[in-house]
Design a protein with these regions (language model features):
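Key residue(s) within conserved catalytic/signature motifs
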Residues: 11, 169-170, 202, 279
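Radical SAM enzyme core and accessory elements
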Residues: 1-146, 224, 440-511
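Short beta-strand motif preference
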Residues: 77-79, 191, 305
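A C-terminal junction/extension of Radical SAM enzymes
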Residues: 26-32, 46, 383-460
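Canonical Radical SAM [4Fe-4S] cluster-binding loop centered on the CxxxCxxC motif
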Residues: 184-219
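N-terminal [4Fe-4S]-dependent radical SAM core
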Residues: 118-121, 141-189
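Conserved non-cysteine loop/helix-boundary elements of the Radical SAM core domain that shape
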Residues: 207-408
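Beta-strand scaffold of nucleotide-dependent catalytic cores
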Residues: 192, 304, 373-377, 448, ...
Length: 511
């Protein structure tokens, strides 16, 4: 256990995130040595927030204790390793009125202290946010050269050379694609299908086993169509730039249900400005010829066939009820039916997977030659089975390193694919990232739009989250973003669909 004691609540979330990057296996608990009055009523950032008795409480069970004291324009940081009594201290001067600069200075000081004490560095430095390419994109939009952007990312965040080069390269490709999009007069549409054949061990997304909900799928589509009607009416004067049907696993729907849903979308919206219509077919065990034909005849331009790995033993461990041959056959079937923009998702850091296993997976993927490959770093959330039943998986190694990511990048390059979007998540194996690779002209527009947060995305369905991006930028060049979420529970979504629509009405009626 790691304990952090603050003399007042400030930047706890940032400190907590950085410590979890360095020490992912440790439980990080936050305490305050200030009076209860200074904490009461504040929106505290971390789950564990307790008061020390008198500011000098002993933490005998803690392996490490950090103390962070804010005094005027100075911050004192003290790090004690209880096992050997080693203590490291530092003090920095800040302009406390500039919160962004103060936060960055604190994180740099904390990072440098831990790096010196452990000899460990992080590939992304102090960056713990999920969208590191947004920073590189902002630098490019501000007219900074590659060298100036590199220096800024290195000095401000201590990111590694490899990650800086990756960010700059992706930001340039994103900008070229996004220049085609009318942010002010356009929007994108997400449709959520929350059903799955089964729940994977690593998954925390909102999903419901189809076997349990099979008799209510049409009720769900009835409610979804009602939300689609509202969206089409509200945005009739806007340009619809991209559509993404995700989940869950959309191909748990029957061919007739898929046809019903897509025809509803096509009848409700003007698609003349739509650059991309994606359906995440996803699980190979949910894909059939009839379902692919329903997608093809309705003009779907991009699909996913997601193996996650091509090692059967791993598929069995994580609860994927399909075989390696199922993946190959589903992919071949999609090609046979004329799909020319197919993505494949792979996950690094799965239980018991070695570098040779990854090489085997990439060899088989290379033989299939998909148009997109998305390399995910395993990020296990609290709601995932790998966490809830962690004792079952405690003896299994889950390793992801720069070597794994470099191997995948090399194979993608051999396939003629270039990195075009990137994002990170909390708790990623090896402190790595998710990277999307694509052939020329096959990049996923929706993926870039949702990461860069430059355009409103209207999301329909259980658990879907709508983001309204305001067109007028803030003084720092960022845009105000407001959100509303639909309830996750399928039964509640069906019963309360009118309330879900009212939430959207309130979000978009604000001036």
């Amino acid at each position: 256990m790691i304990v952090v004691v603050f003399n007042k609540p400030d930047f706890e979330y940032d400190v907590h995130s950085l410590l979890k990057e360095f020490f992912p296996q440790e439980d990080v608990q936050m305490y305050y040595s200030c009076s209860p009055d200074e904490v009461e009523g504040k929106n505290l950032a971390c789950t564990h927030h307790e008061m020390t008795d008198d500011g000098v409480k002993e933490f005998a069970d803690a392996s490490q204790v950090f103390k962070i004291d804010y005094v005027g324009d100075e911050i004192a940081v003290e790090w004690t390793l209880n096992r050997d009594g080693k203590r490291i201290c530092t003090k920095i001067s800040v302009d406390s009125a500039d919160r962004k600069e103060t936060k960055n200075s604190l994180k740099l000081a904390l990072y440098s202290m831990i790096e010196k004490g452990t000899g460990k560095s992080l590939p992304w430095g102090t960056l713990s946010g999920i969208r590191p390419t947004k920073i590189a994109m902002k630098c490019i939009e501000d007219g900074m050269s590659d060298k100036e952007t590199y220096d800024y990312l290195k000095e401000t965040y201590l990111a590694s050379d490899e990650k800086i080069d990756l960010s700059i390269g992706i930001a340039k490709r994103e900008k070229a694609l996004l220049d085609k999009v009318d942010y002010d007069n356009g929007y994108s549409l997400y449709i959520g299908i929350p059903f799955c054949p089964s729940t994977c061990a690593y998954c925390s997304f909102t999903s419901y086993p189809l076997g349990v909900w099979k008799n209510r799928v049409d009720d769900y589509l009835d409610a979804l169509e009602k939300e689609i009607d509202y969206t089409a009416q509200k945005f009739y004067h806007k340009k619809l730039n991209s559509i993404y049907i995700g989940g869950g696993t959309p191909t748990t729907l029957s061919p007739a249900q898929l046809d019903r849903l897509i025809r509803k979308i096509k009848c409700s919206f003007d698609l003349k400005d739509c650059l991309e219509f994606t359906v995440e077919a996803g699980r190979p065990d949910s894909i059939t010829r009839e379902k692919l034909m329903a997608l093809k005849k309705n003009g779907i331009s991009r699909i996913s066939v997601n193996p996650q790995t091509m090692k059967q033993q791993t598929l069995d461990i994580i609860g994927r009820h399909h075989t390696v041959d199922d993946t190959i056959n589903s992919f071949k079937l999609a090609r046979e039916l004329g799909f020319d923009n197919i993505n494949m998702d792979l996950i690094m850091g799965l239980p018991e997977e070695t570098l040779d296993d990854v090489r085997h997976t990439m060899e088989l993927v290379k033989e299939m030659a998909p148009d997109n490959v998305t390399i995910h770093s395993l990020a296990v959330k609290r709601a995932a089975r790998l966490t809830i039943f962690k004792d079952r998986y405690s003896d299994m190694q889950m390793v992801n390193t720069q070597e794994h990511m470099d191997l995948c990048a090399a194979y993608c390059k051999q396939m003629g694919l270039e990195p075009y979007y990137l994002y990170r998540q909390k708790g990623m194996a090896g402190n790595m990232e998710n990277v999307g690779y694509a052939a020329k002209g096959k990049a996923g527009v929706y993926n870039i739009l949702i990461m860069e947060e430059k355009q409103t995305i209207v999301a329909c369905g259980a658990g879907a989250s709508t983001k309204r991006v305001w067109p007028v930028p803030n003084p720092d060049g960022t845009h105000r973003i407001d959100r509303c979420e639909n309830v996750k529970d399928v039964g509640q979504y069906i019963a309360r669909i009118d309330e879900m629509i009212e939430r959207k009405q309130r979000l978009f009626e604000e001036k």
